[in-house]
Amino acid sequence: MARVKSGKVTRRRHKKILKLAKGYWGAKSKLFRVANQAVMKSLMYAYIGRKLRKRDFRRLWITRINAAARAYGISYSRFINGLKKAGIEINRKMLSEMAIHDEKAFAELVNIAKQQLNA
């Protein structure tokens, strides 16, 4: 049976990892084994970070909506409850943008929510 040499394959794999490790400090950008560990860890952190970003933005939107709703004399939870009862399905991102950029429309939504809660 013929001997299989994997020099080209290994070199390509090493180059790929070292390219991903570019900019890392010290051995993490030079030595394959250390760079491989650093790259694997960084990819793991990136994956987790993409999940956390969604949570963070949702929290930010809710905080903004709450602040804007309280300016009109209603809490966030009562505001959302009123909108649900009114059958208005606007997501929190859009509500947050409306609270910042379109105060008249947001005030209308607050009035609708208050009417539904009083009814």
Swiss-Prot record:
Under SUPFAM superfamilies, the record lists:
Ribosomal protein L20 (SSF74731)
A Gene Ontology cellular-component term: ribonucleoprotein complex
Note whether Nucleus occurs among the keywords: no
Report keywords, A-Z.
Ribonucleoprotein, Ribosomal protein, RNA-binding, rRNA-binding
BP GO annotations: ribosomal large subunit assembly; translation
Keyword Protein biosynthesis on this protein?
Answer: no
Write one Gene Ontology MF term.
Answer: rRNA binding
Function noted in UniProt: Binds directly to 23S ribosomal RNA and is necessary for the in vitro assembly process of the 50S ribosomal subunit. It is not involved in the protein synthesizing functions of that subunit.
The UniProt entry's sequence similarity note says: Belongs to the bacterial ribosomal protein bL20 family.
Q: Please name the NCBIfam families in this protein's record.
A: rplT_bact
Q: What is this protein called?
A: Large ribosomal subunit protein bL20
What organism is listed for this UniProt entry?
A: Caldanaerobacter subterraneus subsp. tengcongensis (strain DSM 15242 / JCM 11007 / NBRC 100824 / MB4) (Thermoanaerobacter tengcongensis)
